[in-house]
Amino acid sequence: MKVLFINKFLDKEAIYRDPLGIMILAAVIRPKHKVFVIEPVREDVQKKMDEIQPDVIAYSLRTGYHRYYIDLNLKLKKKYKFVSIFGGPHVTFYPNVINEEGVDTICQGEADEAFAEFIDVLEQGGDITRVKNFWVKTQTGIIKNEKRPLNSNLDSIPFPDREIFDDYEEVCIAKVHSFIASRGCPFRCTYCFNDGMSKSYEGQKYVRRRSVDNVIKELKIVKEKYDLKIAIFEDDTFNLSRKWLKEFCEKFSKLNLKLLPIGVRAELIDEEQVQWLKKANCVSLIFGLESGNEKMRREVLFRNITDEKMIECARLLRKHGIGFATENILAIPTSTLDHDIETLALNLKCKPLYGGAKLMQPYPGTMMYNITVRMGLFKEKDFDVLTDFTASSNLEIDNRLERENLQRLFAIVIRFPFLFRHIRFLIKLRLKPLYAILHEIFKAYIGIKFMPYRRSLREYYVVFRRFIFSRESNIFFQMDGRNKDAICGSSSSIKETSVPKKELPVLLEDSQIVPKKYTKPLKSSQIADDVVATDFDSGER
């Protein structure tokens, strides 16, 4: 069968980040089927569709970008015949997507085995309504299948098929590529999808790791084929297992590569771990600071780590010459502008190379989603106008202008600390477009320092071109997070024609349990009582 993946993998937020999900799914089906990809913002979708004539089109949905793909799929359905498959985190936690016109099937949870089985059964003319993980829309209703058990042996999964992107210079010219060595996270942060995902697989081993040798083998292959210089690891908690980390660092150090893990837990870091990372030529890493207020971290975000531990982690990294960036969340429910400025102040004490700040977004499946709905701060319909969580928030928040300006100035103030004394004045100015431009320029500059290797002029040009053409998340479209035209991309040029369609009844059923919202706002102490954190087994330590 001809299977087409449509994905905006040239999104500027994903520069130097490979679309591993698509690559893995391509790897599991490519031995039997033909695989194609389309980047809908850069390419003429209609022309590519006419050339490929796919049997299946697959989309991976993230909350905030889901509407783009649903609308694009509907336009394609009016001109072409194919089976549409929607997967990804948004579908896993918000399966009512199946009710959307043009959506034929959804795939929930980890899709490696399920996707391959579905494509095989479809080609053979079998019963696709019996494939686990899939919900299928039929003439008589929606067939809902349970999820299959998690694959406990990650070494059995084929290496990501990077060759399907060889025609895209933006992906293959860089000497930086993404890898993942584990799946799952034992922590239960209220804003993270891992809490909801782990509960949906209750009773199973959610945190799993590839063997070190399996990871090293993949690294060697990519280094030989793509002249790899820096390996980015996208694990949720890269330093969870001390035993695994020590072995990995020892073997990685022999590859003559640079290491950049983007999911490090500060509370697990000690000097011994930092020494291992340094030996492995770790040039930079990212850890979540999230909030500069301990009570907010502990009671609202369920991040039980002290300011002192954050500062100590930063001190150890600086001592051993490892650059680092922090991730931060602004506009947390029950927080004030003062709390957000505390977050900036703690970053100034930690002195990261870059401090990324995002505005809180309540994603389906997270505890934060239930909290914000219950407080009346968020309505489900707001998902459809949510676009870029780095630029805006759909929560009902106080001091919106100041907080959105703070988000854009956050990293710049960390780099130029003298601005901190003027921050309250600066964030009151109606200069959001200017701040957005300054932030993106600064971010590009820091990115070069954060991933140090010798780039060719051609690579600089290609990366710049990728940045400019990422229209849906470009700074010029960040001025209004609800700009519908900005999300439509080149798909708007698709000409609609009438084709015979089956009349399929839609089952309107709420699969998302949403508590009743409170009539009064919750205090942070109430939230801690309202949502119970679960214990976890961190595995081999």
Residue ranges with predicted function:
Residues 2, 25-150, 359-365, 504:
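Glycine-rich beta-alpha loop elements in corrinoid/cobalamin-binding modules
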Residues 10-20, 61-66:
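A short, glycine/small-residue-rich beta-strand->loop->alpha-helix junction that serves as a flexible
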Residues 95-100, 334-348:
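Catalytic cores of alpha/beta
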Residues 102-103, 278-284, 351-352:
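Glycine-enriched alpha-helix->loop->beta-strand junction motifs that scaffold or abut catalytic
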Residues 155, 159-325, 345:
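Radical SAM [4Fe-4S] cluster-binding motif and immediate context
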Residues 2-6, 15, 34, 46-50, ...:
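Radical SAM enzyme core and accessory elements
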Residues 62, 90, 234-241, 264-266, ...:
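Short, solvent-exposed turn/loop segments enriched in Gly/Ser/Thr/Pro and often Arg
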